Every structure is written in C-alpha cells, then in structure tokens.
A protein has these predicted regions:
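C-terminal substrate-binding subdomain of Rossmann-fold SDR/epimerase-dehydratase oxidoreductases
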Residues: 11, 15, 19-27, 191-360
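Short-chain dehydrogenase/reductase
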Residues: 81, 85, 133-145, 175-183, ...
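Active-site Tyr-X1-5-Lys
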Residues: 132-165, 181-197
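Hydrophobic positions on the long internal alpha-helix
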Residues: 87, 91-95, 147-148, 259, ...
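SDR active-site strand-loop-helix element
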Residues: 10, 35, 60-64, 103-109, ...
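NAD(P)H-binding glycine-rich loop region in Rossmannoid oxidoreductase-like domains
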Residues: 45-85, 94-97, 109, 114
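Conserved Rossmann-fold NAD(P)-dependent oxidoreductase catalytic core, especially the SDR/UDP-sugar
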Residues: 89-134, 160, 173
C-alpha cells in the first residue's frame, strides 16, 4: 500500500478498528478515513453507496460488525445474522463497484464446526455442524469470507478474509450483557473487588462510565446491588457462566492490528492457497497464537492481577459454548507473522488500561 493511499477503516472506533488505525498511523500512512455509526449506518445501503461515491477509498478494512458474548448471541439471533450480512454485503459490494484495490475482511473463528479437530485448520470450514449458541453470527461470517473468495475467483479482485481468535485490548466492550468473556470477567471481578473493599466511589464511577440496565452511579445503593447481583457480582463472590472447563485462545488486539496491516502490505489472494489447486476454497487466514487457557484459569489469572480476595464460582446450569477452540496458526506463520504478547502480559496490560481509562 502507498503511504498516501486513502484507506477506509470500517469500525475504526471499535476494539480492532481503533488498533488498526493506530498501527497504520505509526507506520506512516497519512490518508485514513472512518465514520462513526452515527455518521454512517453500514446497514443503510444507500448511505454506504453515497460514502463510497464521495470518498473513493483505495483500500478498505472491514472491521465493523455486530458482536457479543454467549448471552447476546443466544438471545438476539436474528440481529446477529441480519445485521452482519447487511454490513458485509453493503461494504464489500460497494468496494467492488468502486474498484477498491484491496480489501481485508475480519471474521471470527466461530466459523469452525463445534467438533472440529483441534487445532482448527482453515480446511475445517463447513465440515460438520456449528456451535448452536452462535450459529447465526457464524453463518454471517462464513458468508462474508465466501463473498470475498467468490469475488476474487470471478472478478480477479484482491479481497483477503482473516479469522481472528478471541480478541481483547484497549477500547474493548465491557457491557456486562454483550461483552466477550475476558472483558466481562475483568469488569465483574473488578466490581466485586470494589464491593468487597467497600469502595463505593469507584463502583459509582464505574457505573457512570458504563451504566448497567439503566443503573448508574446516581442510582440508589439497593438498586446497584440488585443489578450487580443479577450478573453474579456480590461482595462475597463472582458467579461465572458454565463449568470453567472450556479452553479458549486469546490475542491482544494491537497484535491483531499488526497482523492485519502485515497482510495488507505483504499478502495477496494468490498467496492464500497452494499453486495448482483445482478447487480453490478456504483461502481465509487464521490470526491467532496457537496457545490456550481454561476459563477457570483465566478467571484466577484476573483474580491475581486485580488483587480480588473473594470467591469465584461457576454455574454449570449456564452454557459453556464450544468446549475447545484452538486455531492452527501454520498458514499465518508461513506467511511471515508471529505473535509476541502472551495472555499473562495481556491481562496485566488490559487491567491497567481499564483502570487508566476510568481516570480519564
């Protein structure tokens, strides 16, 4: 990519999009463009067309998506498939119609079958049923990567699909209902620590920053205690969903950004499959670490980092989701990129960011 080329980052205020924006700036790219959801609704095809007509980006990074954890995926199934399909169709479609030189589409490793062989290679896609809890979201992401693949095969475009593992980092979503497991766990344990220590100043400040079901720092103490209890948070302990036994892989969002920019700079569609392949498929790239940790061990790592003195319990009546999700990192390594930040360092960086952000 040319340093002066116009690069549109869809979702530039989000966890990954903001990290990609910073990474591009640090590497000397000077013509970045983005729009907030309020400025541009990616569900609105007419608005997306108008944006592309006006801005004419040379490169597009599609990091915008409708995302959430197990609770949200289970409850709002229609929203997850409909909204993600619309976003993808609008942005990828207008990228094609406006002659974008290269596009990067960010998916998710939830595209892989529930019982896929571990670690999951790219070729595991569509070999058996998906995990039920996030099936609508996964199907939307599969459609997105197949759209990229199909445009490349039919029209000779250069659209690359990448499938990141579980991401965490600066600007993460800490909403207790909709956030992913790691940020949700950090916030729950932090709030329980504050309750345990009687630190109501920080509890109220936290709720002012991120209200929960309409409850904020100005709410009555009884209301705050009740809403926190409904999410398993009390001064005596934290209750987490499931058994704690599932294994998960995590990648620091700024490393995901670095891998994304590396691929935009150095990898083309032709590099994503073996020469001479007759049936070209599964050209997406796993972005991951190849290392895993149990949910229970992650919880205890966060307990240690925060200094929380209460108990951690697991509710086996709640779903675990997929029991193991370890991705195969071979293709990414062969293309030339490796991660550097492991989960212990990442949790420390994440909690420090959370505390510093609260001070701003």
């Amino acid at each position: 990519m040319e340093k002066s080329a116009k690069i549109y980052i869809a979702g530039h205020h989000g966890l990954v999009g903001s990290a990609i924006w910073r990474n591009l700036q640090e590497k000397g790219y000077t013509n970045l463009t983005g729009r907030s959801h309020k400025e541009l609704d990616l569900l609105d095809g007419v608005a997306v067309k108008d944006f592309f007509d006006q801005e004419r980006p040379d490169y597009v990074i599609l990091a915008a998506a409708h995302v959430g954890g197990i609770m949200a995926n289970s409850t709002y199934r229609a929203d997850f498939i409909y909204k993600n399909l619309q976003i993808q169709q609008n942005v990828i479609g207008e990228s094609f119609r406006h002659g974008v030189k290269k596009l990067l589409f960010l998916g998710s490793t939830c595209i892989y079958p529930r019982d896929a062989q571990q670690p999951m290679k790219e070729d595991a896609l569509l070999t058996s049923p998906l995990e039920y809890t996030n099936e609508p979201y996964a199907i939307a992401k599969i459609a997105g990567l197949k759209m990229c693949e199909s445009f490349n095969l039919q029209y000779g475009t250069n659209y690359i699909a990448v499938m990141p593992t579980n991401l965490y980092g600066p600007n993460d979503n800490f909403d207790l209902e909709r956030s992913h497991v790691l940020p949700a766990m950090i916030r729950k344990i932090h709030l329980a620590k504050c309750l345990n220590e009687g630190d109501w100043e920080n509890i109220r400040y936290d709720l002012d920053m991120r209200p929960v079901e309409g409850i904020n720092g100005e709410s009555r103490t009884e209301e705050i205690l009740a809403v926190l209890k409904s999410y398993g948070i009390s001064k005596d302990g934290v209750e987490l969903w499931g058994t704690g036994t599932p294994l998960r892989e995590f990648l620091w969002s700024e490393e995901m950004a670095d891998a994304s920019v590396f691929i935009m700079e150095h990898v083309d569609f032709k590099d994503t499959y073996r020469p001479g392949t007759k049936e070209i498929r599964n050209c997406h790239i796993n972005i991951c670490t190849g290392k895993e940790i149990s949910i229970a061990d992650l919880a205890h790592l966060i307990v240690k980092e925060t200094g929380y003195k209460g108990s951690i319990t697991f509710n086996p009546e709640k779903p675990d989701g997929t029991m193991r999700k370890l991705t195969d990192v071979t293709k990414l390594h062969e293309l030339g990129w490796h991660h550097k930040i492991d989960i212990e360092e990442g949790v420390h960086k994440m909690y420090q960011w959370y505390l510093e952000y609260k001070k701003k």
